């Protein structure tokens, strides 16, 4: 094998190893929504408290995301990803022993702290291992891994693994133990594969000047960038919809008379369609050089899908709506990560900081999605008002896409 082939193989090996950390994170994250109806009954939660728990991980991104993005850019991915795994793994173990809303909330917020590191570390890893024109496929790998973790929480975590282990508490315990163990595996793998040895020349030259660039200058450049601010709007809608739907869809369907098993599997359908969107939309957008049009199209698809969920009961129309919604948000997911490195003044060097900014603001939507659905249900006795809020967000995404200048890889 040629030297270039060995470098490429090593780069993909690191991406695959890091992807396991994302899969573990999303499985742990969404074990609570998968078991939400059970936890509500057992712990005695109100709809508002359940919504806060479902939105607690996104809530941590608001104060921490920008700081974490800057830290990942400077600390190194071997230490930072291992620390993230350790934090959310220990928090999941703590969540298995929680006895009420305060302890559940504290542990879930701590999961969010570790989650920020993984969310911004993976785009950074891809940006240093691959040149900008070749980041699409490796980015899809870790996003599919993240979706697999989420889908597994609903498809096998609730109906299979949880009952086998004895309920939600043992499931939380052992998934946390796995994450803590994998922190050691990742750190060892990163050292053996040598992240520095896989860093391409276009990134090394920028790394050499990194120390001379102050954090404050980097942040000012991020905040002043018009196109990045529009990406933030799209990111906010993406997070509003995906966290709102993933956090509440099983409970919404159970309230319509669907059994817990099929309700969880319907949520897996959302994630499966999300994966298809992740794989298809950025590829088509880059081939047609039409990322702006892709953003607008995804917003329209999300709106139509949510209308189907609203009107479809538990029948085929609902299922089609779930698929459309999942496909639309799946398409937005890689776009909000792929656009920042291509923006003038951002590039690979500031990718972690830029994506951190997108999520720092965008996770306001990620927090409000689940909270509004739960609160509006408490106030009205219906999930329809919350779903209408998500549909309104899809319209906003269309407008933000229209205002963008197209950026294509």
Locate predicted features:
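Extracytoplasmic gate region of multi-pass secondary transporters
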Residues: 33, 225-268, 273-282
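Flexible cytoplasmic inter-helical loops of multi-pass small-molecule transporters
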Residues: 188-217
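A late C-terminal transmembrane helix in Major Facilitator Superfamily
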Residues: 345-382, 390
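Helix-breaking motifs and short loop linkers at transmembrane-helix boundaries and internal kinks
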Residues: 44, 76, 97-102, 131, ...
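Conserved MFS/SLC helix-loop-helix module at the cytosolic interface between two early adjacent transmembrane helices
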Residues: 63-100
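Cytoplasmic membrane-interface "Motif A"-like loop-to-helix N-cap segments
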Residues: 74-84, 286-300
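Helix-loop-helix hairpin linking two adjacent transmembrane segments in secondary transporters
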Residues: 133, 141-196
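Cytoplasmic helix-loop-helix junction between adjacent transmembrane helices
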Residues: 107-148
């Amino acid at each position: 094998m040629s030297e270039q082939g060995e470098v490429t193989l090593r780069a993909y090996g690191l991406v695959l190893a890091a992807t396991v950390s994302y899969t573990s994170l999303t499985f742990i994250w969404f074990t609570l929504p998968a078991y939400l109806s059970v936890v509500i009954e057992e712990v005695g939660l109100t709809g508002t408290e359940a919504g806060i728990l479902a939105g607690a991980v996104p809530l941590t991104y608001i104060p921490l995301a920008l700081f974490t993005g800057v830290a990942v850019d400077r600390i190194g991915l071997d230490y930072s990803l291992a620390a993230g795994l350790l934090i959310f793994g220990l928090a999941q173990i703590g969540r298995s022993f929680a006895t009420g809303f305060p302890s559940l909330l504290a542990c879930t917020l701590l999961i969010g702290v570790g989650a920020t590191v993984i969310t911004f570390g993976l785009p950074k890893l891809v940006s240093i291992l691959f040149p900008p024109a070749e980041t699409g496929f490796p980015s899809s790998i870790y996003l599919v891994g993240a979706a697999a973790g989420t889908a597994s929480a609903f498809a096998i975590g609730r109906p299979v693994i949880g009952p086998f282990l004895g309920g939600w508490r043992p499931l939380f315990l052992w998934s946390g133990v796995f994450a803590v163990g994998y922190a050691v595996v990742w750190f060892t793998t990163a050292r053996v594969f040598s992240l520095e040895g896989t860093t391409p020349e276009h990134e090394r030259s920028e790394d050499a000047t990194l120390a001379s660039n102050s954090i404050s200058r980097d942040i000012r450049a991020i905040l002043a960038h018009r196109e990045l601010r529009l990406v933030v709007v799209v990111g906010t809608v993406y997070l509003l919809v995906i966290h709102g739907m993933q956090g509440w869809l099983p409970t919404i369907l159970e309230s319509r008379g669907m059994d817990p098993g099929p309700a969880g599997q319907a949520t897996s359908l959302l994630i499966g369609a999300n994966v298809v969107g992740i794989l298809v939309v950025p590829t088509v957008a880059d081939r047609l050089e039409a990322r702006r049009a892709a953003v607008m199209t995804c917003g329209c698809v999300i709106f139509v899908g949510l209308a189907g969920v609203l009107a479809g009961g538990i029948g085929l129309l609902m299922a089609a709506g779930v698929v459309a919604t999942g496909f639309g948000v799946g398409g937005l997911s890689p776009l909000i990560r792929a656009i920042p490195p291509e923006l003038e003044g951002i590039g690979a060097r500031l990718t972690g900081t830029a994506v951190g900014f997108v999520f720092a603001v965008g996770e306001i939507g990620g927090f409000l999605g689940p909270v509004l659905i739960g609160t509006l249900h408490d106030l009205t006795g219906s999930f329809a008002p919350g779903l209408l809020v998500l549909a309104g967000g899809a319209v906003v995404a269309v407008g933000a896409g229209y205002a963008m200048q197209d950026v294509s890889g």
